[in-house]
From Swiss-Prot:
One of its GO terms (molecular function) is ATP binding. The lineage of its organism: Bacteria, Pseudomonadati, Pseudomonadota, Gammaproteobacteria, Enterobacterales. Pathway: Cofactor biosynthesis; thiamine diphosphate biosynthesis; 4-methyl-5-(2-phosphoethyl)-thiazole from 5-(2-hydroxyethyl)-4-methylthiazole: step 1/1. This is Hydroxyethylthiazole kinase. Pfam families: HK.
Length: 262
């Protein structure tokens, strides 16, 4: 199993494309992370929109550059809105990304996410336990937390990618991105990133945005992981703990975009 590493040049090129195209991202995400997710997209140059009302979700999915479905605070009403948006995204050829939060621990959301897979997501982003559960290999995880190493989920990610046609992202100490054949590994980040709510969910939104960019989607999605890990490392170096990490993280993402444009 060969794992390729993403080059700095590939990451910088993707970030330039991101800023150039400024994707409009329809974020149907969980209630806990909306502000952090929106700010992450904004500082990178995207336009976030948190449209969840069932009567509007389908309409907005047709005009957005990309759609994110995050089931972190799933309710039956949210599920109806998400289904409407996904169906419209498929009809409009809008790329959409699934973040199957805690799918291995809870039956209702697992059934819902499996139903959504029939609509062929462009990308799927989760931790090792979530990806393994979605692939039907194991049910696990401790709520939103993983109990498996990212590398252990690579076979499940490849299987899921081949079955759905999606690019699958497994996040952890090292991130892995695969289309079922190629695998790209991304080093970096810091354990402090796991002590702040929303870094993974925000990454899923950036992944969704990257699916709307031209070029190699696998490399663009892998670049999203690289930006987040790189910003995390920079932020940790300036932070005293989780409380000061978040503003430093947003500043670090902003600085990455400025460096690419310089």
């Amino acid at each position: 199993m060969q794992v390729d590493l993403l080059s700095s040049a590939q990451s910088a090129h993707a970030l330039h494309l991101f800023h150039q195209h400024s994707p409009l991202v329809h974020c149907m995400t969980n209630d806990v992370v909306q502000t952090f997710t929106a700010n992450t997209l904004l500082v990178l140059g995207a336009s976030p929109a948190m449209v969840i009302e069932t009567e509007e979700a389908s309409q907005f999915a047709a005009i957005a550059s990309a759609l994110l479905i995050n089931v972190g605070t799933l309710t039956q009403l949210c599920a109806q809105s998400m289904c409407a948006a996904v169906e419209q995204a498929k009809s409009s050829q809008t790329p959409w990304t699934l973040d199957p939060v805690a799918v291995g621990a809870l039956d209702y959301r697992r059934r819902f996410c499996l139903e959504l897979l029939s609509h062929k997501p462009t990308a799927i982003r989760g931790n090792a336990s979530e990806i393994m559960a979605l692939a039907g290999i194991a049910n696990g995880g401790r709520g939103v937390d993983t109990t498996d190493a990212a590398a252990n989920a690579i076979p499940a990610a490849q299987t899921l990618a081949r079955e759905t046609g999606a690019i699958v992202v497994v996040t952890g100490e090292m991130d892995y991105v695969t289309d079922g054949h190629r695998i790209i590994g991304i080093h970096g980040g810091d354990p402090l990133m796991t002590k702040v709510v929303g870094t993974g969910c925000a990454l899923s939104a950036v992944v969704a945005a990257c699916c709307a960019l031209p070029g190699d989607t696998l490399e663009n999605v892998a670049s999203a992981c690289h930006w987040m890990k790189q910003a995390g490392e920079r932020a940790v170096a300036r932070s005293e703990g989780p409380g000061s990490f978040v503003p430093h993280f947003l500043d670090a993402l902003w600085q990455l975009t400025q460096e690419v444009q310089a």
